[in-house]
A protein has these predicted regions:
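Beta-barrel outer-membrane channel/assembly domains of diderm bacteria
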Residues: 1-96, 136-146, 218
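Detector for outer-membrane/organellar transmembrane beta-barrel domains
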Residues: 11-13, 57, 175, 180-254
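Surface-exposed coil loops of outer-membrane beta-barrel proteins
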Residues: 21-33, 70-80, 92-183
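Transmembrane beta-strands of outer-membrane beta-barrel pores
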Residues: 22-30, 44-46, 53-55, 63-69, ...
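Short, low-complexity, polar/charged sequence segments that are solvent-exposed and flexible
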Residues: 37-41, 115-119, 155, 166-168, ...
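Hydrophobic, lipid-facing positions within transmembrane beta-strands of outer-membrane proteins
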Residues: 43-47, 81-86, 130-134, 176-180, ...
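Short, surface-exposed, polar/charged, turn-prone segments marking secondary-structure boundaries
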Residues: 46, 69, 123-128, 222-225, ...
Length: 254
């Protein structure tokens, strides 16, 4: 296994790298102006394993340890697993990845480390970020990159993703998500751009589309970005309406 190979070569630190990411704090919840509960709480605990087997072959595995352990019907993976892929550098310009990976969306908020984000925008909060599939990256020069990706369009069943389906909507025979992404930087890396377009068949003959654009400026200690995102689909593409219309489960803690 890759792990056995890694532990036999401790001097080659590129082969196996293990990181533990933790984000915790003290939360105080108020209800109607009065303190309801105050306690320490972990927001994120993640195990992150990366490595390079050789100059061409590499891998990445990352899993959240505090939630998302229910298996997903379509991918047969826990939602807690964010990365589980291997990559291969075909040559200096082309790189292939296969497995569960982040979707090649544009924008800069999406690309930030989740531990550094206090509150996501609705678009990034509800978009499916990690899906199983394959990706191909092409880098014509040091300042430009074009990536093409095909992944599943969802992790679980249609009902899990969209709730109760409208009359006449049937599941697609090939539930795939297609993404084209372009990244570039200009003026000696002063300006950075990250754009993407995506499409998927949500149900038979029913499609969704999304566009992500990100512009950033990085000059010494100054860093700022501005993202514009748009999504449209026959079924609730982000799950916002689905979440609002799901029946609440009543019950009291004992």
């Amino acid at each position: 296994s890759l792990f056995e190979y890694a532990i036999k070569i401790p001097k080659r630190n590129k082969v196996f790298n293990l990181d533990l990411e933790m984000h915790a704090g003290f939360n105080a919840d108020f209800f109607s102006g009065k303190l309801d509960e105050a306690a320490f709480r972990f927001r994120d605990v993640k195990i992150d394993v990366t490595g390079e087997v050789n100059d061409r072959l590499f891998y990445w595995y990352r899993q959240t340890l505090n939630g998302g352990y229910e298996g997903q019907a379509l991918e047969n993976l826990n939602e807690s697993i964010e990365y589980a892929y291997i990559g291969y550098k075909l040559n200096e310009r082309f790189t292939l990845t296969a497995g569960k990976q982040d979707v090649f969306y544009g924008g800069f908020e999406y690309d930030e480390n989740p531990l550094l984000i206090y509150e996501y925008s609705d678009m990034n909060e509800y978009s499916l970020c990690y899906l199983t599939g394959i990706g191909l990256g092409y880098q014509p020069n040091e300042s430009q990159e074009i990536r093409l990706q095909v992944t599943n369009s969802r992790m679980g069943s249609m009902e899990d993703e969209y709730g109760r389906l409208p009359e006449g909507f049937k599941k697609p025979r090939v539930p795939l998500f297609y993404t084209l992404n372009w990244n570039g930087n200009f003026l000696d890396e002063l300006i950075h751009l990250r754009y993407s377009v995506s499409a998927a068949e949500q149900a038979q003959g029913k499609y969704m589309y999304s566009v992500f654009t990100g512009q950033s400026i990085e000059a010494g200690p100054v860093y700022a970005y501005f993202d514009v995102m748009y999504s449209r689909g026959k079924l609730d593409p982000l799950g916002l309406l689905t979440e609002l219309t799901q029946p609440e489960v009543s019950g009291e803690e004992e």
